[in-house]
Curated annotation (Swiss-Prot):
GO biological process, one term: translation
Quaternary structure note: Part of the 30S ribosomal subunit. Contacts proteins S8 and S17. May interact with IF1 in the 30S initiation complex.
HAMAP family: Ribosomal_uS12_B (MF_00403_B)
SUPFAM superfamilies hit by this protein: Nucleic acid-binding proteins (SSF50249)
GO MF term set: rRNA binding; structural constituent of ribosome; tRNA binding
GO cellular component, one term: small ribosomal subunit
Database matches in InterPro entries: NA-bd_OB-fold, Ribosomal_uS12, Ribosomal_uS12_bac
Entry similarity comment: Belongs to the universal ribosomal protein uS12 family.
Annotated protein name in UniProt: Small ribosomal subunit protein uS12
Function text: With S4 and S5 plays an important role in translational accuracy.
3-methylthioaspartic acid modifications at: 89
Keywords carried by this UniProt record: Methylation, Ribonucleoprotein, Ribosomal protein, RNA-binding, rRNA-binding, tRNA-binding
Gene behind this protein: rpsL
């Protein structure tokens, strides 16, 4: 425990919280251009071909972003919207692409959790 005199001399140092999504620069989403679209394999207990794209953002950063859902239409110069949110089994992937906005189409034939995948309400 610090004495009153020590606190007057030094004071308490406040811990600075480091951002988990620095490329967004305190914005909810950012726009960017795909520089590479590829698949990669996850960490040890899991097995899959995860769809990922490398994106050059308007903030100047180049980041890896996960493409959720079944199937996508992204190519090299597609313009996408990026949000925060890491993928636990893909090291270095700290962002998600927003489905159904800009050049990224929503997931086809999706009936549940549609808002997360940019799918319109099906016609009756």
């Amino acid at each position: 425990m610090a004495t009153t005199n020590q606190l007057i001399r030094k004071g308490r140092t406040t811990l600075v919280e480091k951002s988990k999504v620095p490329a967004l620069k305190a914005c909810p989403q950012r726009r960017g251009v795909c520089t590479r679209v590829y698949t990669t394999t996850p960490k040890k207990p899991n097995s899959a071909m995860r769809k990922v794209c490398r994106v050059r953002l308007t903030s100047g950063f180049e980041v890896s972003s996960y493409i959720g859902g079944e199937g996508h239409n992204l190519q090299e110069h597609s313009v996408v919207l990026i949000r925060g949110g890491r993928v636990k089994d893909l090291p270095g992937v700290r962002y998600h692409t927003v489905r159904g906005s800009l050049d990224c189409a929503g997931v086809k034939d999706r009936n549940q959790s549609r808002s997360k995948y940019g799918t319109k309400r099906p016609k009756k």
